[in-house]
Regions:
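General secondary-structure edge motif
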Residues: 5, 35, 99, 136-143
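Conserved FAD-binding catalytic core of PHBH/FMO-like flavoproteins
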Residues: 1-46
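Short amphipathic alpha-helical segments, especially helix-boundary/capping motifs
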Residues: 29-33, 77, 90-94, 132-137
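Low-complexity, flexible helical/coil segments
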Residues: 2-10, 71-76, 106-108, 127-133
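Internal, well-ordered alpha-helical segments in soluble enzyme and binding-protein domains
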Residues: 6-9, 21, 51, 55, ...
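FAD/FMN-dependent oxidoreductases across multiple families
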Residues: 15-19, 39-118
């Protein structure tokens, strides 16, 4: 069924419905994998929510697997905005509520680990400690990205493709908030310039 040494991170070869749609295929072995259908879209659009049908079509038509069993299913939604984070006495928001989600990707897990480490190291003075936040550089870049996404949904597959054409370590560092200025420039230089520049104004 699967090549357990290769994962498919974003497969855009599927119906976009004037939005942004892709599949993940993450094999655990040659016979087991996590397959996910993902939409970046308006939650009010119920036409996008026939997830079971989407997965069935993808598994049978794209992956060419006819005899299979789904052992576990889950659904989720990641908000592509940061809630207002107000520090309260003896209380600190964590995870998505604590603005740990990268708005350009939805990635949160590594940021939660960094935030948890920060809280642990400052637990004795947590009421006097400033709120842990993502680097403002990434917040700025993500906000531009979201504007591009909103105004150019049909171009997003091409944009993601260009980004992932960068060296893998560069992409991983960028997505993990660890990129140097040179790595940032490397990724930005691959992007369609005019589309992004228009979002600055």
């Amino acid at each position: 069924f699967f090549d357990d040494k290769i994962f498919n991170l974003m497969d855009f070869d599927c119906d976009q419905k004037d939005s942004v749609h892709f599949f993940y295929t993450l094999p655990f072995s040659k016979t087991k994998a996590l397959i996910e259908t993902t939409w970046i879209s308006d939650l009010n659009d119920n036409s996008l929510k026939d997830y079971d049908k989407q997965l069935k079509n993808y598994i049978e038509s794209k992956l060419k697997i006819k005899n299979y069993k789904i052992n576990f299913k889950e659904t989720g939604a990641i908000p592509l905005f940061h809630p207002k984070n107000i520090k309260k006495l003896n209380q600190m928001e964590i995870g998505t509520a604590g603005n740990m989600t990268r708005l350009s990707t939805g990635y949160t897990f590594l940021n939660i680990q960094e935030q948890s480490r920060y809280i642990r190291e400052n637990i004795e003075s947590i009421t006097k400690t400033k709120i842990f936040s993502l680097d403002k550089k990434y917040q700025f870049l993500d906000n531009i990205f979201l504007k591009v996404l909103k105004n150019n949904p049909k171009k997003m597959a091409q944009i993601f493709y260009k980004m992932f054409n960068c060296p893998s370590n560069t992409v991983i560092n960028f997505l993990s908030n660890k990129s140097s200025i040179y790595e940032d420039i490397s990724i930005i230089s691959k992007m369609p310039k005019w589309i992004f520049l228009k979002q600055l104004f």
